[in-house]
């Protein structure tokens, strides 16, 4: 029922908030719900742990954070989105779905980390940036022994090679790589363990991340 209502809310507000070009029933279920859930369904710590704190960076229309919250109801969810209009939509969405334990922040990730360092068990995102960039802006949010979960396409291997310096600098270790197909789409999901506290100089300002990748 919640996913049917979620679909209806997307279709109702799509033109107002410019959410997506995929507004048919089939495309919303496939591209929003099934494809966004697929990378996480193989990760057993979602079902083994209760009250996990998760931050979804660049949440947009609620993918994957709201989808995960619908399935794992005990999840303490933070949705981080820099676009103000999409934050307005996220507020409407979570209210109409009746979701509890959800915080919505209209900020850039590198700004919010100053007040929420080492606060979450899991950080994740979908289609926000290349792996080196998203790891840099995500790592400081996560507690030591927490996880960064990054769904990627077949380009994962290429992106991880470029990210090797930032992975080392931020004391991250890839502990799993989930490789599977879902409806003709090849998912590669990197799961990184955070082994030490993130150095205070990270994340750097976004313009510096873009201009001077490590």
Swiss-Prot record:
Gene3D superfamilies per UniProt: Vaccinia Virus protein VP39
* Family under the similarity heading: Belongs to the methyltransferase superfamily. RNA methyltransferase RsmG family.
The UniProt function text for this chain reads: Specifically methylates the N7 position of a guanine in 16S rRNA.
| Main subcellular localisation | cytoplasm
CDD domains per UniProt: AdoMet_MTases (cd02440)
EC class (word) = transferase
Protein known as = Ribosomal RNA small subunit methyltransferase G
Underlying gene: rsmG
Keyword set includes S-adenosyl-L-methionine: yes
* GO function term, MF aspect, one: rRNA (guanine-N7-)-methyltransferase activity
Which positions does UniProt annotate for S-adenosyl-L-methionine binding?
Answer: 58, 109-110, 126
Identify the EC number(s): 2.1.1.-
**InterPro entries given in the database record:** rRNA_ssu_MeTfrase_G, SAM-dependent_MTases_sf
Q: Where in the cell is it found?
A: Cytoplasm
Under NCBIfam families, the record lists: rsmG_gidB (TIGR00138)
- Kindly state which keywords UniProt assigns to this record, in alphabetical order: Cytoplasm, Methyltransferase, rRNA processing, S-adenosyl-L-methionine, Transferase
Q: Does the keyword Aminoacyl-tRNA synthetase apply?
A: no
The organism encoding this protein is Ureaplasma parvum serovar 3 (strain ATCC 700970)
Q: Name one GO cellular component term.
A: cytosol
